[in-house]
């Protein structure tokens, strides 16, 4: 039996391969028990949600080549979880919000708000000394959307995503902007000729927390959090295809689900015209706060979900005018379904984290697939 384990602060879910041949997904409601309290959760039929381990405000999840699981955190710890992933060890305690980590041969990369850092690392190593951590490349820092997500692409290069400070801030990854205002997209690190430097890869993304490469096509996709100033229903949240030089419009332009419009909340002249805006491939309802994402690798979950993307929707803090907390967008995991290498629709995967009275017992932040084919989330 194959299992998918899902973390939630962190929790684990075991998912047997019982969905072959079903399209769309079939669901069932199960009783999930946490701290001696039971709550109903909706999962794909045949799948089971389990709790795994507690950590202090874990965020982005990364599996090392040897199968160890790592988690950055808002609390400052970088956690290491060796199989079976039910015990979290502190690899290193750092200031500066170590939101995410990545690996390349002989070293661990740690993305903090103000810079990308590295340290020597060998598989199975249980501790990293602060003295070993050195700055690889400075990042635009400052307040507001201060997470930094790092990943190593299929091309071996290092990519980092970062958001603009507010709903509408004149910040852009490109020429004409000071270094600290080069925010709102994905950058790639140029190495090999002297000091490493950042190059813009994709711009016009307000807060692209999660990104991953499609396993078949090698194309980069990212989630993106839209602004809050246009009400509860606009603009929709984005799941976008990124290409070298692509411009996604924010904060000067917003996609309303049908067309791209000028957003007058930012009066400064846009760095690029509206005709160059790349629209998202699929959207989620506004205020859902999509964060981490990962593509389903071959052999994980059900074969009908292979090469689809799983996205963590964190849920909204805002609510409709006159509505109570029970009307907020509910946290959940969703699957972006792909056909012939292109995104076609969004299906729920796991829901039930928000109760009928609006109380929440979990808000997914990131997702990652383990070497066991299991799906983990924080």
Stretches found by the model and what they are:
Residues 21-44, 147, 164-176, 181-184, ...:
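Beta-propeller domain segments
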Residues 50-56, 90-95, 135-142, 199-204, ...:
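Surface loop/turn motifs at the tips and blade-to-blade linkers of beta-strand repeat domains
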Residues 55, 64, 104, 151-155, ...:
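Structural WD40 beta-propeller signal
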Residues 59, 78-107:
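Blade-loop segments of beta-propeller domains
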Residues 61, 101, 150, 208-211, ...:
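Hydrophobic core register within WD40 beta-propeller blades
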Residues 68-71, 107-110, 158-160, 220-222, ...:
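Hydrophobic beta-strand segments that make up the repeating blades of beta-propeller
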Residues 77-80, 107, 115-117, 185-187, ...:
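A short loop-to-beta-strand structural motif that recurs across blades of beta-propeller domains
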Residues 97-98, 114-153, 161, 202:
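Asp-box/WD-like beta-propeller blade repeats and closely related beta-sheet repeat scaffolds
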């Amino acid at each position: 039996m194959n299992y998918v384990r899902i973390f939630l602060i962190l929790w684990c879910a075991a998912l047997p391969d019982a969905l072959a041949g079903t399209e769309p997904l079939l669901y069932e409601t199960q009783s999930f028990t946490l701290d001696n309290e039971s709550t109903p959760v909706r999962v794909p039929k045949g799948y089971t949600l389990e709790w795994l381990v507690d950590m202090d405000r874990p965020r982005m999840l990364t599996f090392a080549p040897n199968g160890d699981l790592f988690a950055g955190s808002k609390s400052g710890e970088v956690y290491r979880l060796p199989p079976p992933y039910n015990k979290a060890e502190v690899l290193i305690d750092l200031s500066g919000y170590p939101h995410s980590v990545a690996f390349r041969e002989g070293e661990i990369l740690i993305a903090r708000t103000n810079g990308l850092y590295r340290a020597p690392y060998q598989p199975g190593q249980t501790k990293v000394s602060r003295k070993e951590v050195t700055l690889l490349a400075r990042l635009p820092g400052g307040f507001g959307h201060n997470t930094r997500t790092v990943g190593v692409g299929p091309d071996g290069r290092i990519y980092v995503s970062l958001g603009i400070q507010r709903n509408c801030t004149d910040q852009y990854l490109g020429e004409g902007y000071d270094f600290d205002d080069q925010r709102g997209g994905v950058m790639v690190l140029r190495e090999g000729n002297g000091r490493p430097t950042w190059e813009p890869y994709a711009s016009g993304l307000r807060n692209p927390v999660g990104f991953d490469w499609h396993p078949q096509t090698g194309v980069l996709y990212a989630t993106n959090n839209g602004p809050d100033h246009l009400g509860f229903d606009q603009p929709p949240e984005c799941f976008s295809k990124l290409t070298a030089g692509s411009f996604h419009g924010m904060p000067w332009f917003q996609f309303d689900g049908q067309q791209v419009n000028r957003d007058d909340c930012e009066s400064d002249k846009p760095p690029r015209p509206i005709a160059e805006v790349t629209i998202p491939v699929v959207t989620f309802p506004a205020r859902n706060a999509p964060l981490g994402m990962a593509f389903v690798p071959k052999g994980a979950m059900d074969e009908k979900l292979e090469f689809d993307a799983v996205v963590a929707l964190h849920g909204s803090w805002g609510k409709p005018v006159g509505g109570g907390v029970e009307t907020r967008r509910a946290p959940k995991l969703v699957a972006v379904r792909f056909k012939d290498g292109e995104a076609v629709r969004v299906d729920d995967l796991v829901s039930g984290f928000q109760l009928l009275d609006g109380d929440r017992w979990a808000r997914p932040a990131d997702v990652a697939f383990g070497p066991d084919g299991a799906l983990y989330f924080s």
